């Protein structure tokens, strides 16, 4: 049975193994079993690597101290779990302001909306920063077939059972679920994970 993997080092592109690639237009792209994807942000062939990372001296290393701390917000029927480090500012949680507040004034009120509405909002969180418990049981797996989804001018969304292997032990930072986001712009301080820097940098691709 083929196992989907993302394998790379601080100095290499993202190497996707046995993982379908979905373009920003929603169409499945034709790729070999091992596909080299840009993460320096400078390739002229995005989402693919064209070797530019070696020319510009790209180093895909985290710039800050990686620290995962889970915050639990318990309600009557559901517990919201938040991993602040993984948040990349997608903003979907703000669609349910009664529960999650706004970007400038976040809050976590697990009893402020129906459970179904909260769960639906949490499932929109691409980074895995938000998850939930029901009767203290984690609910973190939402996707089936592994796949990579390219966001236009944004990160690479990894969905399904994809194993991440790199030289920074980044897998230890990931949630126990089946989705996370990887930086494509080269500017994240949490590399290889996305921190939302693509927006402020005006990344295109």
Feature map (PLM): residue ranges:
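Short cysteine/histidine-rich metal-coordination sites, predominantly Zn2+-binding motifs
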Residues: 53-70, 103-115, 138-146, 198-205
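A short acidic Gly-Thr/Ser loop motif
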Residues: 39-43, 185-188, 197
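Iron-sulfur cluster-binding cysteine motifs and their immediate structural context
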Residues: 46-57, 91-106, 122-136, 191-201
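Boundary-flanking segments of nucleic-acid-binding domains in nuclear regulatory proteins
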Residues: 169, 178-180, 192, 201
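Short Fe-S-cluster ligation motifs
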Residues: 5-13, 17-18, 67-94, 112-135, ...
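Short, structured motif recognition centered on aromatic/hydrophobic residues
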Residues: 14-16, 35-38, 48-49, 130, ...
């Amino acid at each position: 049975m083929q196992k989907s993997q993302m394998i790379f080092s601080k100095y290499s592109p993202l190497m996707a193994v046995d993982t379908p690639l979905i373009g920003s237009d929603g169409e499945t792209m034709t790729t070999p079993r091992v596909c080299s994807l840009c993460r320096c942000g400078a390739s002229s062939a995005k989402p693919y690597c064209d070797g530019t990372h070696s020319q510009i001296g790209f180093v895909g290393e985290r710039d800050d101290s990686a620290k995962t701390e889970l915050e639990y917000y318990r309600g009557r029927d559901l517990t919201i779990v938040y991993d602040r480090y993984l948040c990349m500012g997608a903003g979907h949680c703000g669609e349910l302001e009664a529960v999650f507040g706004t970007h400038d004034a976040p809050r976590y009120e697990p009893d402020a909306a129906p459970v179904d509405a909260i769960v639906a909002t949490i499932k929109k969180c691409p980074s895995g920063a938000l998850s939930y418990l029901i009767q203290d049981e984690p609910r973190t797996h939402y996707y089936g077939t592994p796949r990579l989804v390219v966001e236009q001018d944004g990160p690479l969304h990894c969905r399904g059972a994809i194993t991440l292997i790199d030289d920074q032990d980044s897998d230890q930072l990931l949630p126990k679920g089946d989705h996370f986001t990887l930086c494509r712009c080269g500017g994240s301080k949490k590399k290889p994970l996305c921190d939302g820097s693509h927006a402020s940098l005006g990344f295109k691709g």
